[in-house]
């Protein structure tokens, strides 16, 4: 697949589309992540595993060895066909092993972490970017090429029909009638290769309750004594989160102290695919059928609906996008899943903590002082919750007033080598600094400004 780069689409458009279209009565419905990838199931020889981008080797460890391409985990999220159960929506498979997808084992830190990484990215795309993006796009700048000015943030396939994609994105629910002959346009699959996690000292927040976390993996063992401000973690390898904590009690009764742990994660090599889905309604619930492909039974109907709405022939039923890197703030509190016995029977030799949430690193606000969307532009945003209509309306107002600041912020946070200094995090919750100072303070690498990188 060949790609061409479209410059300067802000982070708010790095994905598409949650069902919450303002024109529909179901605008507050929380969609499950629309990720289904069926091609991976199992290939004993490993020959097709190299094509699985979600678990392929990272850019720094690319190898032609098929065995290496079978390491790690791949996650798919089930598509809803009725009532969505958020506690039973993901399935996991370990590459190189036989068998079907299985639920992630929360007692295995590497599975739990991978699931949360994947789920956090997908939640970010669906719940905290897409709906504001649509509103912003349609109201302020209704053109792909006109949005932003600062960086190459997204890459489309060369055969993209820009007008067609714009219509699909801006009218993500194509309503043919009041029955079951409607089509939804949204995220079909999402894959990524690896993630960078910064050193402990750089991601400790100013709060006294923040605790240092040591992340160990096979990829790091050989360089534990080497200072590296952006250690690269290969998600094919096991990642263990071990937390050094204050404890109370004795023996097996020792418990980790409470506290918030945060790590900045820069996700790399992202590919997203968007497609149409046949939809219908069951009372107030949305039911999803199969994704439309070039030769699926519903393709003809989709093309008829499209032509009736716009008077043009629908050329494509799916679009693949390559996204530049973006960053998540991994947030979790200590949860002991396993206690390893020490040589002297000390039960507190090691405790394993798994993350329990994702947040995205935003500046406190766009204009130094609290604004209408202050609840949205908080330092730590809960991505497990969908933005409300009020939040999105307020956000739009701020975006209209501060478009250039938004563009600068978006360009900066998507750099490949994001480095947040400890001093920058300690000084503020970004409240007293200007946007310019904010960028100068945190987007530096070894004392050099990285803001202009592309």
From Swiss-Prot:
It is a lipid-anchor. Its main location: membrane. Residues 55-64 have a biased composition (Low complexity). Residues 65-87 have a biased composition (Polar residues). A lipid is attached at residue 22 (S-diacylglycerol cysteine). Residues 55-87 are annotated as: Disordered. This is Uncharacterized lipoprotein MG095 homolog. The lineage of its organism: Bacteria, Bacillati, Mycoplasmatota, Mycoplasmoidales, Mycoplasmoidaceae.
């Amino acid at each position: 697949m060949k790609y061409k780069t479209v410059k300067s689409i802000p982070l708010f458009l790095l994905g598409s589309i949650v069902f919450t279209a303002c024109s529909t009565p179901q605008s507050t419905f929380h969609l499950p992540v629309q990720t289904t990838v069926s091609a991976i199931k199992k290939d004993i020889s490993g020959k097709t595993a190299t094509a699985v981008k979600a678990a392929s080797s990272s850019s720094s460890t690319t190898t032609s060895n098929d065995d290496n391409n079978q390491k790690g985990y791949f996650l798919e999220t089930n598509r809803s066909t009725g009532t969505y159960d958020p506690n039973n929506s993901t399935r996991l498979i370990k590459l190189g092993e036989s068998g079907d997808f299985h639920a992630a084992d929360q007692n295995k830190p590497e599975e739990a972490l991978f699931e949360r990484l994947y789920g956090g990215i997908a939640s970010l795309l669906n719940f905290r970017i897409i709906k504001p993006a649509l509103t912003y796009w349609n109201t302020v700048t209704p053109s792909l090429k006109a949005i932003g000015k600062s960086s190459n943030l997204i890459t489309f396939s060369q055969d993209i029909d820009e007008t067609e994609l714009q219509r699909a994105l801006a009218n993500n629910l194509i309503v043919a009638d009041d029955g079951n002959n409607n089509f939804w346009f949204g995220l079909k699959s999402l894959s990524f290769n690896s993630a960078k996690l910064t050193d402990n000292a750089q991601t400790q927040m100013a709060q006294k309750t923040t605790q240092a976390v040591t992340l160990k993996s096979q990829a790091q063992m050989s360089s534990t004594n080497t200072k590296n401000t952006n250690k690269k973690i290969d998600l094919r390898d096991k990642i263990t989160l071990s937390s050094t904590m204050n404890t109370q009690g004795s023996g097996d009764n020792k418990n980790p102290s409470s506290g918030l742990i945060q790590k900045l994660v820069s996700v790399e090599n992202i590919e997203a695919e968007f497609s149409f889905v046949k939809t219908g309604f069951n009372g107030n619930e949305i039911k999803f059928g199969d994704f439309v492909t070039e030769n699926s039974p519903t393709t003809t109907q989709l093309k008829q609906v499209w032509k009736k709405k716009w008077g043009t022939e629908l050329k494509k039923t799916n679009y693949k996008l390559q996204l530049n890197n973006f960053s998540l703030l991994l947030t979790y509190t200590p949860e002991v899943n396993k206690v390893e016995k020490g040589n002297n029977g000390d039960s507190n030799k090691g405790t394993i903590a798994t993350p329990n949430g994702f947040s995205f690193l935003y500046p406190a606000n766009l204009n130094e002082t609290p604004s209408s969307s202050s609840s949205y532009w908080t330092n730590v945003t809960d991505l497990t919750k969908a933005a409300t209509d009020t939040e999105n309306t307020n956000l739009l107002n701020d975006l209209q007033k501060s478009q250039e600041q938004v563009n600068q912020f978006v360009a900066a946070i998507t750099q490949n080598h994001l480095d947040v200094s400890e001093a920058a995090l300690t000084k503020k919750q970004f409240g007293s600094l200007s946007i310019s100072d904010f960028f100068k303070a945190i987007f530096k690498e070894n004392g050099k400004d990285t803001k202009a990188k592309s």
